[in-house]
Amino acid sequence: MEKNIEIKNLCKVYGNITILDDINFVAKEGRVTAFLGPNGAGKSSTLRILLGLDQATSGSATISGINYKDIRNPLFVVGATFDGLGSPSDRTVYQHLRIVAASNGIEKSRIDAVLAVTDIAHKKNESIGHLSLGETQRVSLATALLGNPQFLILDEPTNGLDPSGIRWLRNFLKEQSEKGKTILLSSHILSEVEAVTDDVVFIHKGKIIANGELKKIMKDTVSLEEVFFNLIQEGGKEDEVIL
């Protein structure tokens, strides 16, 4: 089975408000797919459904054809950064990772490995509450990597990172995709992911307005921001989706 993430005919309605309107896209194995749009566009709602944290009104969001809730030992399959660390502020970074590893049957040796990969080992004895936002992002990523998963689902991974941290993240994502990982990341800051993404999915007001390879979507434009605003001005209709 292909190691893809597939969002198919996904709809989410709260009362009489449509949050997601027939969302369709695929994040492919060995590629970085950037899920882009302004705050409130529907990115987090889509990821919440994908990770089993919310239910769709209709449609599906699957990982290798399986719903997240049906995956056995999910941390070995999917690593996600979403909704913070979920640990007490006085717990150290190492304690946090040790608890997550132990509760999921992950070998202790993986802790030092992910601390090294995310360049946060020097903070392992620091309390989580004393970390900067960028450092917390690195710990979230280290947590996601504990099970050495095939899939990485990252919600706004550049938040809180300084320029050197963003450069590091870009290199990290490139290395992981070259290893064959399937990476889906969301962001509302288009310029920060442009250098690392292979495929782009634009969402606006709950609808996909463009979807395809970065080089095809960019064409003769100078930036993803320009592409996005051009699409908005043109109306972003479904028949304008780029494949």
Regions found by a protein language model. Give the residues of each.
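Conserved ABC ATPase "signature" region
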Residues: 98, 102, 108-123
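Catalytic Walker B motif of ABC-type/P-loop ATPase nucleotide-binding domains
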Residues: 152-156
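ABC ATPase "signature
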Residues: 211-212
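Conserved ABC transporter NBD signature motif
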Residues: 59-74
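A short, surface-exposed alpha-helical micro-motif characterized by mixed small hydrophobic
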Residues: 193-195
